[in-house]
Amino acid sequence: YLWFLYKAMTAIKEPLALITTQDYLLPCTKWQEEGRWEVTDDGQKRLGYELPNFSVRQKDNVYIVNEESLSEALTECGDNSNLLFKKFLTEIIPDFKNALIAALQKQNDIECILTICNCPSLNAAAEKYNIPVINLELGPLRSPTYLFTGYFDFSGVNGNTEAEKRYFAAKQQGVVFNKKNRISALRDFFINSRNDDDYIEPEYDVGIVLQVENDSNILAFSNSFDNQALLDYAEGSFIGKKIVRPHPGSHFRLNENLGYEIDNNNLSIIDFLKKCRKILTINSSVGLEAMLMNIPVKILGDCSYAFCNVDDVDERVERLTFYLFSYLVPFDLLFNAEYIRFRLTFPSEHEILSKHILYYLSSREKQSIIDMKTSTTDVVENGMYERGLLKELEELKIKNI
């Protein structure tokens, strides 16, 4: 997770407390020699960070966690690193928790902890000092195809998230989502390209989306499904023509099989989805993209968007609207100190919606206000809410002229 550290150090200018292992602080030249994507120009440009110069960050407090704190757990896992990772993601590891407590007790002014993984050991250590833990990750909709989104969750990421709980809380708070929206309109708001409108007659009954074998989604939040179990499930549960899309980051290649065709990422993901009447996934974000294209999805694992996958169309629109505009966060805000502090006040869902929609509108500053009106989804209260934000934005622009 080098990018996570580099992004935080680039975006957050004030002093940080870094709890890490020694290898994260090695010179970037080492990672360049090993060809890691995080130190390439493309990686930096895509995620908006610079390679850090640790020597000029003297005000950062760095706490090195000894990896020996995980050695007993690794032994218990039979030296299986994947099993250890699952344990790391789902259980409290006593020695590791104590190592984190030792690091936290050296710093008495921590506002929150930013992490990229579910980590019960970290949660337990932070709870001892009443420090909020915020789980951040790349969101399911990403640039350049979509507006870049991220996950910002006080409960978990990938699995064990607060998405569904927050949706029902928003309803109780009186947030009125516009049921007259079409799912295609929601997608149109987030998609950057308008060149995918050509209709393609689906030729496959089921599209099967595979995932990286040792990713946290599979190891910890798959309801015990892996790629092989997914293929077995598809064979036993679905008749008709099938196509399988392996993940480009997979370490394995599928053998040819009479039961399905293979798309080795020759198609764009959008063209792949267009060719399918239904999508089967464990918990890939491709499932969300399919839902936004009105393609039926079967989700077998745990994921943040699964609660949106309901049969009632009006209810699905409401849930997707909340998920896209309130639960998901504009990526540029993930490491924004002002935004993080805003969320630490536990604002209402109306306030979160307002912050996100206003960001999306203002980020399209090259557009005229009239153009923005035509490209804005009427999310809340049949559009009255957004029209108020547009008026606010227009007045702000006039003041700055």
Regions from the PLM with identified roles:
Residues L2-A8, P52-G159:
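Active-site and donor-binding regions of nucleotide-sugar-utilizing enzymes
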Residues E67-D79, L83, L210, A229-N264:
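Catalytic donor nucleotide-activated moiety binding site of glycosyltransferases and closely related
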Residues I92-L104, F225, G240-M293:
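Donor nucleotide-activated moiety binding/catalytic core segment of transferases
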Residues Y167-G174, C308-I401:
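C-terminal amphipathic helix plus adjacent low-complexity
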Residues N195-S250, T345:
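Active-site donor-nucleotide binding/catalytic segment of nucleotide-sugar enzymes
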